[in-house]
């Protein structure tokens, strides 16, 4: 609601979230869904200079406003004493953005930017919608769900938040409508892959993952010998040299902007199990070996659990993923067409893939109710 209490002819919506693709991807997917419903809606994204949002939000065609980041230490450290001052500065900056936008609603996706945005919106009496991406909620969204709003939406059923309603995780329309088989030939040509060879896609998420990079690349010769080609996204700041030991390519990229093509090219993926990755991979029916990030609240293991429980994926602890494990297990799985087909069938439909439209409609309903 704007301060005057009247719904403007063109709603103004501020979306707060940043840091990693886990926050920016659902934000962009939601913005796209809002624009499909009403192309005139004013959409402003709120982020910090530290995150992926400084690149991907403008590339997606949305206005981005930056506020100072306020990392919240998980354990008592001297940095904790600086938090109140930083928070006041960041809340003030967020309030300025909300005021200038005449925001009708704030939608928060978590991350450093969300806590000050929630406080600023609450003080301004602007309606707040929280979307929690992980099975285990983060600090910012816990705070907002408890103190700031009753509009709390989650990516997974059973997430422990007050007022939680399961809607799923918004993902890009290019992913949710992907026909992997129809796009496979184009996708493999795009990445310079053989059109027919069994294909492994490897990704550690938007920042890459050293353990995954080292374990899979260390088994490159064995994968080649088994007749397997590899598409490996190593992360924007990482380097990796893999000797070409056979006729099939081992393609190394820092970042994949066309994830739809990467999923279409692949028969199997080795990946982390962030909420966005699990939703996209299972949504397109791609069999997966999930390697949960071994830090945080243990949310990545829980994110993958619904898919793994029905047989759509395999879960392996980060510490257990080694070169020897890859040699012993990946070729065996990737060359078993019957099992891959069963995994693909099992994964499809486990997790909702229409959350972008669902969340967009909820946001607009909140705006209408507040008017």
Identify the function of each model-found stretch.
Residues 3-4, 332, 352-371:
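C-terminal alpha-helical cap of glycosyltransferases
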Residues 10-21, 40-91, 167, 319:
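Conserved nucleotide-sugar phosphate-binding/catalytic loop shared by glycosyltransferases and other
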Residues 46, 51, 56-60, 183-189, ...:
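Donor-nucleotide binding loops and adjacent catalytic segments primarily
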Residues 93-106, 114-129, 142-147:
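Glycosyltransferases and closely related glycan-assembly transferases
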Residues 122-185, 190:
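Active-site-proximal region of nucleotide-activated glycan assembly enzymes
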Residues 124, 264-266, 282-291, 310:
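Conserved donor-binding/catalytic loop of nucleotide-activated donor transferases
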Residues 288, 306-319, 331-332:
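A short acidic/histidine/glycine-rich donor-binding loop in glycosyltransferase catalytic cores
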Residues 339-353:
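A short, well-ordered alpha-helix in the C-terminal region of glycosyltransferases
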